[in-house]
Amino acid sequence: MMGSSSQELQTALTDISKTCHHMWEDSKDLQGRFVNDLAELQRLQCTITNFERAQHPEQAFQAKQAMTEMQKKATGVYEMLAQRRNEIISKLNDGANIASMMQGQLINDKLFTWKNAQKLAQIGMPFDDREQLLDEIQLEFEFLADNIWQLNMFACWMCDLCRRAPQLNDGLAQSSAAKLTTISEQLNRLLFVLVSQSFIVSVQPEPVLKTQHKFVTEVRLLIGDKLGIRQQLMNTNVSVKIIAEDEARVMSVDCDAQKEIRANKQVGSISNDFEKLTMDERGHLSAKFNNSKLTRIAHRKPPPKGASDMKCAANMQAATDQKYALLFFITPFQMGNLSKEEQLDVWTLSLPIMVTVHGSQDCDAQVAILWHRAFASISRDPNVHDVTAVSWENLAIMLRNKFSLFTGARRPLSESDLAYLSEKIIIPNMPDQKPITFTRFAKQAMREELAFSFWEWFFSIMQLIKQKLLKYWDEGWCIGFISKHDASQSMCMLPNTSFLLRFSDTQTGAVSIGFVCQDDDGQKVPFHLSPLTIKDLDQLSLASRIASCPQLKDIRYMYPNIDKEEMLRYFESEERHRVGGPESPGGYIQSEIVMVAKTNGNFRRASAAPSMFGADSPSPLSIQSKLDWSPGEIHQSMMEMTDELGHVLNVGGMDSMHPDANTLLGPAFKNPTFHPHDQQQHLQFVDMSHPQMMQQQHHGHNHNHTHNQFYPS
């Protein structure tokens, strides 16, 4: 049957189950006839003895003739019975082998593939047919449970039939019973594994759990209500505990270890840690944990005092390096004709998870679990080593899917976006590029002069988009992933002046406004405002900054040709609703923060000698440093600019016969030959106390203008 399709195997197993049923009925009938024939032979033997004692030779002779005929008949019945036993043993063997093959395909291929897709879905890989595929898998679990159970019933019934049959000297009944017992044990093991493996986490918890926060998860028993299991589970609970991932790996190798781990290896506390298995209208037998909360997690013990062993220090893991798993287990229960010593102890494990106690740990926790979800095996096989390096192509797929999942953006990362990202993580000027390691991706500084890794930079951008720039990103109003140099060149090449939004690559989680102005000679000069973070945009939204900046008022287009006013109209009603009416409840006139970029038309060539305290340079008395100024990277007429805002808001009988049955059958009895069958992620503050920086204009509605200054290229 190797290479057969699942449907062919199902058909074959169904046919075997039906055949075994008919064979068992035939065997029962033949054994009954054989027992009756033996009883008749015993009666004839007594009759002959009585006739001989009474000296009635003619009657004795007739009785002997009748006995000879009966012996022939009984022998024929016995031969057919022996043949039926051989046939049913062979069929049961075939059925067990097919069931084992199907079970291996179901668990090791189909369910494994589903679980792996479930894992990848947690980093954004599409898995829209998750429920449909799992329902199809459940149908196969139910089919196997039914057929394995039926085969086991026939094996047990035949074994009981053989044990209650006349025990002849040929030992056929005894050997048949032994073989049937072996088959039954094999089928029992298959059933144990099937039920155990049918218990899965159908809805995984979030990859990163935070203490004192609720989490949602669901477990499901895929054999459904087969074998009458729902009634067996009426008084049982599904419980959940959190254990270390190291212990979960031990359990994957030594299943018996789960009892000891379950009892003694608790690393945290979970409220509402048990639920009942319930059957819904779709036939799903599941337990939903919707109100559970991780209330406590044990901290790692510090190294012993005075420990100087470097290995000891290396083995110590930070909170964001420690992985955990949720252990789900059902109260042990008995099933069918299994003995009390063979109760089912069913459990399953979630995928590895991370636990944080503070939002500051989220970036590191997210990257550790992201790498696992993308590249690690779900089997917890100790012989499978963790993936420490991957190609850029595989990493790009992970980043693209994680980006869409995390931000909720409809617009995915484009090929140009990914090309820009690759420049940030692939070491330049190396023709023989090696795979990208986890350390390079998540730990190592993105560039030597920076204090953050590629992941920290990318994660903070995802946070910025999710919280502040989602509409800009989805509508294409934010180019985002483009270098300052390329942005400057692109804007200067357009016939009209324009501005764009790009993510800073020298600061985490920040967006910069780049635009072009014309100098006295009519040449376009690019400027890039100091990057704005989430905190900055909390105080004054990006739309408000764009709308209020005088230098952007005459620029009609966002790069390349997007109508600025159309974009601003989208935010107008939203901003008006946020700000409220012109007067506050106390009768005060509200103030308004306005972003002003001070250009005043004072553009100088790069060759011009700058003054010590020119109007285009930041004052040395300001808290603003040169790092706040952003060069445009165009070789002529370069200028830099930072925007400085005034911060004014806070924002399932028969008895044996005569033992000497062989003498009753006579010399015509032939022992049939029995052939045995052998059998798985700031605004810079201007020093407002300095008189040179106090440039405010008072209007009727009290607008506060804080001026940006330029640093010449």
Curated annotation (Swiss-Prot):
| GO biological process terms held by the UniProt record | cell surface receptor signaling pathway via JAK-STAT; defense response; regulation of cell population proliferation; regulation of transcription by RNA polymerase II
Judging by the UniProt lineage, the source's domain of life is Eukaryota
* SUBUNIT field: Forms a homodimer or a heterodimer with a related family member.
**GO molecular function terms noted in the UniProt entry:** DNA-binding transcription factor activity, RNA polymerase II-specific; RNA polymerase II cis-regulatory region sequence-specific DNA binding
Q: Name one GO cellular component term.
A: nucleus
Give the principal location in a single coarse category: cytoplasm
User: Where in the sequence is the signal peptide annotated?
Assistant: none
- Keywords, sorted A to Z: Activator, Cytoplasm, Developmental protein, DNA-binding, Nucleus, Phosphoprotein, SH2 domain, Transcription, Transcription regulation
Q: Which Pfam families match?
A: STAT_alpha, STAT_bind, STAT_linker
Which SUPFAM superfamilies does the record associate with it?
A: p53-like transcription factors (SSF49417), SH2 domain (SSF55550), STAT (SSF47655)
Q: Which family does it belong to?
A: Belongs to the transcription factor STAT family.
Q: Which ranges carry the SH2 domain?
A: 477-574
Name of the protein described by the UniProt record? Signal transducer and activator of transcription 1
Tell where it localizes: Cytoplasm; Nucleus
Q: Please give the organism.
A: Caenorhabditis briggsae
Please describe what this protein does. Answer: Carries out a dual function: signal transduction and activation of transcription. Activated STAT proteins play a role in repression of dauer formation. Neuronal expression is held in check by negative signals through the TGF-beta pathway that target the daf-3 transcription factor.
Q: Which InterPro entries match?
A: p53-like_TF_DNA-bd_sf (IPR008967), SH2_dom_sf (IPR036860), STAT (IPR001217), STAT_linker (IPR048988), STAT_TF_alpha (IPR013800), STAT_TF_coiled-coil (IPR015988), STAT_TF_DNA-bd (IPR013801), STAT_TF_DNA-bd_N (IPR012345)
